[in-house]
Amino acid sequence: MESIGVVAPHTMHFAEPLRLQSGSVLGNYQLVVETYGELNAARSNAVLVCHALNASHHVAGVYADDPRSTGWWDNMVGPGKPLDTNRFFVIGVNNLGSCFGSTGPMSIDPATGTPYGARFPVVTVEDWVHAQARVADAFGIERFAAVMGGSLGGMQALAWSLLYPERVAHCIDIASTPKLSAQNIAFNEVARSAILSDPDFHGGDYYAHGVKPRRGLRVARMIGHITYLSDDDMAEKFGRALRRADGALDAYNFNFDVEFEVESYLRYQGDKFADYFDANTYLLITRALDYFDPAKAFNGDLSAALAHTKAKYLIASFMTDWRFAPARSREIVKALLDNRRSVSYAEIDAPHGHDAFLLDDARYHNLVRAYYERIAEEVGA
Protein backbone atom coordinates (compact mmCIF):
# COMPACT_ATOMS: atom_id res chain seq x y z
CA MET A 1 0.00 0.00 0.00
CA GLU A 2 1.21 3.47 -0.84
CA SER A 3 2.20 6.00 1.75
CA ILE A 4 0.23 9.18 2.13
CA GLY A 5 3.39 10.95 0.96
CA VAL A 6 4.68 14.37 1.94
CA VAL A 7 2.64 16.17 4.59
CA ALA A 8 2.96 19.43 6.48
CA PRO A 9 1.67 20.53 9.88
CA HIS A 10 -0.13 23.77 10.49
CA THR A 11 -0.69 25.77 13.63
CA MET A 12 -4.11 26.82 14.88
CA HIS A 13 -4.36 29.79 17.25
CA PHE A 14 -7.12 30.11 19.85
CA ALA A 15 -7.91 33.38 21.59
CA GLU A 16 -10.78 32.14 23.76
CA PRO A 17 -9.41 31.21 27.20
CA LEU A 18 -9.50 27.53 28.14
CA ARG A 19 -10.35 26.75 31.75
CA LEU A 20 -8.53 23.61 32.82
CA GLN A 21 -9.75 20.95 35.21
CA SER A 22 -7.27 22.21 37.81
CA GLY A 23 -8.91 25.65 37.78
CA SER A 24 -6.03 27.27 35.91
CA VAL A 25 -6.83 29.19 32.73
CA LEU A 26 -4.85 29.24 29.50
CA GLY A 27 -5.39 32.46 27.59
CA ASN A 28 -4.08 32.54 24.05
CA TYR A 29 -2.75 29.14 23.04
CA GLN A 30 -1.93 27.20 19.92
CA LEU A 31 -2.33 23.62 18.74
CA VAL A 32 -0.35 22.01 15.94
CA VAL A 33 -2.48 19.92 13.60
CA GLU A 34 -2.03 17.65 10.58
CA THR A 35 -4.80 16.49 8.27
CA TYR A 36 -4.97 13.73 5.67
CA GLY A 37 -7.61 13.06 3.05
CA GLU A 38 -10.56 15.26 2.07
CA LEU A 39 -13.45 16.43 4.23
CA ASN A 40 -16.65 15.64 2.36
CA ALA A 41 -19.39 18.18 1.70
CA ALA A 42 -21.51 16.85 4.56
CA ARG A 43 -18.49 16.98 6.91
CA SER A 44 -19.46 13.48 8.01
CA ASN A 45 -16.27 11.55 7.24
CA ALA A 46 -13.92 13.11 9.80
CA VAL A 47 -11.86 10.90 12.10
CA LEU A 48 -9.82 12.24 15.02
CA VAL A 49 -6.70 10.23 15.89
CA CYS A 50 -5.47 10.88 19.45
CA HIS A 51 -1.82 10.34 20.31
CA ALA A 52 -0.11 8.55 23.18
CA LEU A 53 2.65 9.73 25.51
CA ASN A 54 5.61 10.48 23.26
CA ALA A 55 3.79 10.87 19.93
CA SER A 56 2.30 13.96 18.30
CA HIS A 57 0.10 15.33 15.55
CA HIS A 58 2.38 13.64 12.97
CA VAL A 59 0.29 10.50 12.50
CA ALA A 60 1.20 9.58 8.92
CA GLY A 61 3.30 10.56 5.93
CA VAL A 62 6.73 12.19 5.86
CA TYR A 63 8.06 15.73 5.91
CA ALA A 64 9.67 17.09 2.76
CA ASP A 65 12.89 18.04 4.55
CA ASP A 66 13.28 14.68 6.31
CA PRO A 67 12.37 11.51 4.40
CA ARG A 68 12.94 9.45 7.57
CA SER A 69 10.28 11.34 9.52
CA THR A 70 7.56 8.74 9.07
CA GLY A 71 4.40 9.38 11.10
CA TRP A 72 3.96 7.26 14.20
CA TRP A 73 0.90 5.38 12.83
CA ASP A 74 1.81 5.40 9.16
CA ASN A 75 1.04 1.68 8.84
CA MET A 76 -2.54 2.36 9.99
CA VAL A 77 -3.41 5.63 8.23
CA GLY A 78 -3.14 6.33 4.52
CA PRO A 79 -4.50 5.41 1.07
CA GLY A 80 -5.82 1.86 1.14
CA LYS A 81 -4.75 1.35 4.75
CA PRO A 82 -7.10 0.30 7.58
CA LEU A 83 -8.00 3.96 8.15
CA ASP A 84 -8.24 4.82 4.47
CA THR A 85 -7.56 8.46 3.64
CA ASN A 86 -9.21 7.96 0.26
CA ARG A 87 -12.45 7.71 2.22
CA PHE A 88 -11.91 9.57 5.48
CA PHE A 89 -10.63 12.98 6.54
CA VAL A 90 -8.18 12.31 9.36
CA ILE A 91 -7.03 14.86 11.94
CA GLY A 92 -4.05 14.55 14.26
CA VAL A 93 -3.71 17.12 17.06
CA ASN A 94 -0.65 17.72 19.23
CA ASN A 95 -1.95 18.04 22.77
CA LEU A 96 -1.47 20.94 25.14
CA GLY A 97 1.62 20.51 27.28
CA SER A 98 3.48 18.63 24.58
CA CYS A 99 6.85 19.60 23.14
CA PHE A 100 6.06 19.40 19.42
CA GLY A 101 4.70 22.87 18.79
CA SER A 102 1.45 23.13 20.75
CA THR A 103 1.48 25.42 23.77
CA GLY A 104 3.42 23.74 26.54
CA PRO A 105 6.29 24.18 29.01
CA MET A 106 8.71 25.20 26.25
CA SER A 107 6.37 27.97 25.04
CA ILE A 108 6.86 31.58 26.05
CA ASP A 109 4.68 32.66 28.95
CA PRO A 110 3.30 36.08 27.89
CA ALA A 111 3.29 37.18 31.53
CA THR A 112 7.06 36.78 31.89
CA GLY A 113 8.53 36.67 28.39
CA THR A 114 10.32 33.43 29.31
CA PRO A 115 9.38 29.75 28.83
CA TYR A 116 6.64 28.47 31.13
CA GLY A 117 8.81 25.64 32.38
CA ALA A 118 7.49 24.29 35.66
CA ARG A 119 4.86 27.07 35.74
CA PHE A 120 2.87 25.44 32.96
CA PRO A 121 -0.37 24.18 34.54
CA VAL A 122 -1.11 20.50 34.99
CA VAL A 123 -3.38 19.26 32.20
CA THR A 124 -5.72 16.28 32.07
CA VAL A 125 -7.15 14.01 29.41
CA GLU A 126 -10.40 15.93 29.71
CA ASP A 127 -8.58 19.23 29.09
CA TRP A 128 -7.09 17.78 25.91
CA VAL A 129 -10.50 16.67 24.70
CA HIS A 130 -12.01 20.11 25.27
CA ALA A 131 -9.14 21.66 23.30
CA GLN A 132 -9.60 19.11 20.51
CA ALA A 133 -13.29 19.99 20.38
CA ARG A 134 -12.31 23.55 19.49
CA VAL A 135 -10.24 22.17 16.61
CA ALA A 136 -13.34 20.33 15.40
CA ASP A 137 -15.34 23.54 15.69
CA ALA A 138 -12.77 25.38 13.58
CA PHE A 139 -13.18 22.78 10.82
CA GLY A 140 -16.97 22.97 11.07
CA ILE A 141 -17.16 19.33 12.18
CA GLU A 142 -20.22 18.80 14.34
CA ARG A 143 -19.78 15.05 14.73
CA PHE A 144 -16.81 12.76 14.18
CA ALA A 145 -17.38 9.56 12.26
CA ALA A 146 -14.88 8.12 14.75
CA VAL A 147 -12.45 9.13 17.45
CA MET A 148 -9.60 6.65 17.66
CA GLY A 149 -6.52 6.11 19.78
CA GLY A 150 -4.23 3.57 21.37
CA SER A 151 -2.97 3.56 24.96
CA LEU A 152 -3.28 7.15 26.25
CA GLY A 153 -4.90 7.97 22.89
CA GLY A 154 -7.56 5.39 23.70
CA MET A 155 -8.28 7.16 26.97
CA GLN A 156 -8.90 10.35 25.00
CA ALA A 157 -11.23 8.50 22.63
CA LEU A 158 -13.19 7.15 25.60
CA ALA A 159 -13.28 10.62 27.17
CA TRP A 160 -14.66 12.05 23.92
CA SER A 161 -17.58 9.63 24.07
CA LEU A 162 -18.26 10.75 27.65
CA LEU A 163 -17.78 14.50 27.34
CA TYR A 164 -19.29 14.94 23.87
CA PRO A 165 -21.70 12.03 23.39
CA GLU A 166 -23.54 13.79 20.56
CA ARG A 167 -20.33 14.44 18.63
CA VAL A 168 -18.90 10.92 18.39
CA ALA A 169 -20.47 8.24 16.21
CA HIS A 170 -17.81 5.60 16.91
CA CYS A 171 -15.17 5.28 19.61
CA ILE A 172 -12.19 3.06 18.74
CA ASP A 173 -10.23 2.35 21.91
CA ILE A 174 -7.12 0.17 21.54
CA ALA A 175 -4.75 -1.22 24.20
CA SER A 176 -6.15 1.15 26.78
CA THR A 177 -7.68 1.22 30.25
CA PRO A 178 -10.45 3.04 32.13
CA LYS A 179 -7.90 4.09 34.78
CA LEU A 180 -4.34 3.32 35.80
CA SER A 181 -3.68 0.59 38.32
CA ALA A 182 -1.52 1.27 41.38
CA GLN A 183 1.31 -0.54 39.59
CA ASN A 184 1.06 1.76 36.57
CA ILE A 185 1.00 4.86 38.75
CA ALA A 186 4.08 3.46 40.49
CA PHE A 187 5.94 3.07 37.18
CA ASN A 188 5.13 6.70 36.36
CA GLU A 189 6.30 7.87 39.78
CA VAL A 190 9.66 6.10 39.43
CA ALA A 191 10.11 7.64 35.98
CA ARG A 192 9.23 11.12 37.26
CA SER A 193 11.57 10.69 40.22
CA ALA A 194 14.43 9.99 37.83
CA ILE A 195 13.77 13.35 36.15
CA LEU A 196 13.10 15.34 39.31
CA SER A 197 16.31 14.09 40.94
CA ASP A 198 18.51 14.93 37.95
CA PRO A 199 20.81 17.84 38.98
CA ASP A 200 20.17 19.43 35.59
CA PHE A 201 16.40 19.64 36.21
CA HIS A 202 16.68 22.91 38.18
CA GLY A 203 13.11 22.73 39.43
CA GLY A 204 11.84 22.57 35.85
CA ASP A 205 13.54 25.80 34.75
CA TYR A 206 16.51 24.12 33.07
CA TYR A 207 15.92 26.15 29.88
CA ALA A 208 17.36 29.24 31.59
CA HIS A 209 20.44 27.25 32.57
CA GLY A 210 21.08 26.02 29.04
CA VAL A 211 20.94 22.37 30.09
CA LYS A 212 18.56 19.44 29.88
CA PRO A 213 17.97 16.67 32.46
CA ARG A 214 19.12 14.01 30.01
CA ARG A 215 20.07 11.44 32.64
CA GLY A 216 16.63 11.54 34.18
CA LEU A 217 14.91 11.40 30.80
CA ARG A 218 17.03 8.43 29.77
CA VAL A 219 16.11 6.45 32.87
CA ALA A 220 12.44 7.43 32.57
CA ARG A 221 12.34 6.16 29.00
CA MET A 222 14.15 2.94 29.89
CA ILE A 223 11.62 2.22 32.63
CA GLY A 224 8.70 2.97 30.34
CA HIS A 225 10.09 0.98 27.44
CA ILE A 226 10.37 -2.18 29.53
CA THR A 227 6.64 -1.96 30.24
CA TYR A 228 5.80 -1.61 26.54
CA LEU A 229 7.36 -4.96 25.59
CA SER A 230 6.28 -8.47 26.52
CA ASP A 231 8.58 -10.92 28.28
CA ASP A 232 8.42 -13.28 25.30
CA ASP A 233 9.23 -10.48 22.87
CA MET A 234 12.26 -9.43 24.90
CA ALA A 235 13.40 -13.04 25.17
CA GLU A 236 13.16 -13.48 21.40
CA LYS A 237 14.87 -10.18 20.57
CA PHE A 238 17.66 -10.30 23.16
CA GLY A 239 17.60 -13.35 25.38
CA ARG A 240 20.82 -13.29 27.38
CA ALA A 241 22.98 -12.39 24.39
CA LEU A 242 26.13 -10.46 25.23
CA ARG A 243 27.30 -7.36 23.43
CA ARG A 244 31.06 -7.52 22.96
CA ALA A 245 33.09 -5.29 20.67
CA ASP A 246 35.74 -8.00 20.29
CA GLY A 247 33.20 -10.52 19.03
CA ALA A 248 33.47 -12.85 22.01
CA LEU A 249 30.01 -14.22 22.71
CA ASP A 250 30.50 -16.12 25.96
CA ALA A 251 32.83 -14.03 28.11
CA TYR A 252 31.84 -11.49 30.74
CA ASN A 253 33.66 -8.18 31.17
CA PHE A 254 33.30 -8.23 34.97
CA ASN A 255 32.48 -4.52 35.13
CA PHE A 256 29.41 -2.28 34.89
CA ASP A 257 29.70 -1.28 31.25
CA VAL A 258 27.07 -2.47 28.79
CA GLU A 259 27.24 -6.26 28.91
CA PHE A 260 23.98 -7.61 27.51
CA GLU A 261 22.23 -6.77 24.25
CA VAL A 262 19.12 -5.76 26.17
CA GLU A 263 21.14 -3.20 28.14
CA SER A 264 22.48 -1.72 24.92
CA TYR A 265 18.97 -1.52 23.48
CA LEU A 266 17.55 0.25 26.53
CA ARG A 267 20.41 2.75 26.63
CA TYR A 268 19.94 3.46 22.93
CA GLN A 269 16.21 4.04 23.43
CA GLY A 270 16.90 6.28 26.42
CA ASP A 271 19.49 8.36 24.57
CA LYS A 272 17.26 8.78 21.53
CA PHE A 273 14.33 9.84 23.69
CA ALA A 274 16.42 12.37 25.63
CA ASP A 275 17.48 13.94 22.33
CA TYR A 276 13.97 14.92 21.26
CA PHE A 277 11.62 14.94 24.27
CA ASP A 278 11.10 17.53 26.99
CA ALA A 279 11.30 16.59 30.66
CA ASN A 280 8.52 18.94 31.80
CA THR A 281 6.26 17.48 29.13
CA TYR A 282 7.03 13.98 30.39
CA LEU A 283 5.99 14.99 33.90
CA LEU A 284 2.76 16.56 32.64
CA ILE A 285 1.69 13.67 30.43
CA THR A 286 2.40 10.95 32.97
CA ARG A 287 0.39 12.90 35.54
CA ALA A 288 -2.48 13.18 33.05
CA LEU A 289 -2.32 9.40 32.76
CA ASP A 290 -2.47 9.05 36.55
CA TYR A 291 -5.49 11.33 36.89
CA PHE A 292 -7.68 9.74 34.22
CA ASP A 293 -10.53 7.97 35.99
CA PRO A 294 -14.00 8.73 34.61
CA ALA A 295 -15.63 6.47 37.21
CA LYS A 296 -14.24 8.55 40.10
CA ALA A 297 -17.18 10.97 39.97
CA PHE A 298 -19.55 7.98 40.16
CA ASN A 299 -18.12 6.35 43.28
CA GLY A 300 -15.94 4.11 41.16
CA ASP A 301 -18.86 2.75 39.12
CA LEU A 302 -17.71 2.65 35.49
CA SER A 303 -21.12 1.48 34.30
CA ALA A 304 -22.70 4.59 35.80
CA ALA A 305 -19.99 6.76 34.23
CA LEU A 306 -20.76 5.37 30.78
CA ALA A 307 -24.55 5.49 31.14
CA HIS A 308 -25.05 8.61 29.01
CA THR A 309 -22.74 7.61 26.14
CA LYS A 310 -24.25 7.27 22.67
CA ALA A 311 -21.39 6.09 20.48
CA LYS A 312 -20.77 2.64 19.09
CA TYR A 313 -17.51 1.10 20.25
CA LEU A 314 -14.64 -1.02 19.04
CA ILE A 315 -12.47 -2.09 21.97
CA ALA A 316 -9.30 -4.07 21.25
CA SER A 317 -6.56 -5.43 23.48
CA PHE A 318 -3.47 -7.61 23.09
CA MET A 319 -2.97 -10.81 25.02
CA THR A 320 0.70 -10.09 25.81
CA ASP A 321 0.10 -6.50 26.94
CA TRP A 322 0.79 -6.41 30.68
CA ARG A 323 0.92 -2.61 30.93
CA PHE A 324 -2.78 -2.31 30.04
CA ALA A 325 -3.82 -5.93 30.18
CA PRO A 326 -6.91 -7.28 28.36
CA ALA A 327 -8.76 -7.43 31.66
CA ARG A 328 -8.76 -3.63 31.70
CA SER A 329 -10.37 -3.45 28.26
CA ARG A 330 -12.93 -6.02 29.35
CA GLU A 331 -13.91 -3.69 32.20
CA ILE A 332 -14.88 -1.11 29.59
CA VAL A 333 -16.74 -3.71 27.54
CA LYS A 334 -18.71 -4.90 30.57
CA ALA A 335 -19.66 -1.34 31.53
CA LEU A 336 -20.87 -0.67 27.99
CA LEU A 337 -22.87 -3.90 27.89
CA ASP A 338 -24.40 -3.01 31.26
CA ASN A 339 -25.77 0.05 29.44
CA ARG A 340 -26.80 -1.94 26.34
CA ARG A 341 -24.36 -0.07 24.15
CA SER A 342 -23.19 -1.40 20.79
CA VAL A 343 -19.67 -2.73 21.39
CA SER A 344 -17.35 -5.00 19.44
CA TYR A 345 -14.42 -6.50 21.34
CA ALA A 346 -11.30 -8.28 20.13
CA GLU A 347 -8.47 -9.77 22.14
CA ILE A 348 -5.58 -10.19 19.73
CA ASP A 349 -2.84 -12.80 20.14
CA ALA A 350 0.19 -10.68 19.20
CA PRO A 351 3.60 -11.24 20.83
CA HIS A 352 4.73 -7.64 21.09
CA GLY A 353 3.16 -6.48 24.36
CA HIS A 354 1.70 -3.01 24.76
CA ASP A 355 3.50 -1.64 21.71
CA ALA A 356 1.55 -4.07 19.50
CA PHE A 357 -1.00 -1.31 18.87
CA LEU A 358 1.65 0.54 16.84
CA LEU A 359 2.75 -2.43 14.74
CA ASP A 360 1.62 -3.93 11.45
CA ASP A 361 -0.12 -7.12 12.57
CA ALA A 362 -2.41 -8.61 9.92
CA ARG A 363 -5.18 -9.77 12.28
CA TYR A 364 -5.20 -6.46 14.11
CA HIS A 365 -5.22 -4.38 10.92
CA ASN A 366 -7.92 -6.53 9.34
CA LEU A 367 -10.08 -5.96 12.40
CA VAL A 368 -9.69 -2.18 12.19
CA ARG A 369 -10.15 -2.20 8.42
CA ALA A 370 -13.40 -4.14 8.70
CA TYR A 371 -14.71 -1.76 11.34
CA TYR A 372 -13.94 1.28 9.19
CA GLU A 373 -15.69 -0.39 6.26
CA ARG A 374 -18.79 -0.41 8.43
CA ILE A 375 -18.33 3.26 9.31
CA ALA A 376 -17.76 4.16 5.65
CA GLU A 377 -21.10 2.61 4.74
CA GLU A 378 -22.83 4.63 7.45
CA VAL A 379 -21.40 7.98 6.35
CA GLY A 380 -21.28 7.29 2.62
CA ALA A 381 -17.51 7.61 2.45
Curated annotation (Swiss-Prot):
Q: Where in the cell is it found?
A: Cytoplasm
Would you name any one GO CC term?
cytoplasm
Q: What class of enzyme is it?
A: transferase
Source taxon at top rank? Bacteria
Task: List the GO biological process terms.
Answer: homoserine metabolic process; methionine biosynthetic process
**Where do the catalytic residues lie?**
S151, D321, H354
Specify where it is mainly localized: cytoplasm
Which residue numbers delimit the AB hydrolase-1 domain?
A: 45-360
Catalytic activity, EC: 2.3.1.46
Signal peptide interval: none
Return the annotated site residues (Important for acyl-CoA specificity).
Answer: R323
Q: Where does substrate bind?
A: R221, D355
GO terms assigned for molecular function: homoserine O-acetyltransferase activity; homoserine O-succinyltransferase activity
Q: Which UniProt keywords apply?
A: Acyltransferase, Amino-acid biosynthesis, Cytoplasm, Methionine biosynthesis, Transferase
Q: Which reaction does it catalyse?
A: L-homoserine + succinyl-CoA = O-succinyl-L-homoserine + CoA
Q: InterPro entries attached here?
A: AB_hydrolase_1, AB_hydrolase_fold, HAT_MetX-like
Q: Copy the pathway line from the protein's UniProt record.
A: Amino-acid biosynthesis; L-methionine biosynthesis via de novo pathway; O-succinyl-L-homoserine from L-homoserine: step 1/1
Q: Which Pfam families match?
A: Abhydrolase_1 (PF00561)
Q: How does the record describe its quaternary structure?
A: Homodimer.
NCBIfam families on file: homoserO_Ac_trn, PRK00175.1
Give the similarity note.
Belongs to the AB hydrolase superfamily. MetX family.
Relate the protein's function as given in its record.
Transfers a succinyl group from succinyl-CoA to L-homoserine, forming succinyl-L-homoserine.
**Name recorded for this polypeptide:** Homoserine O-succinyltransferase
Gene from which the chain derives: metXS
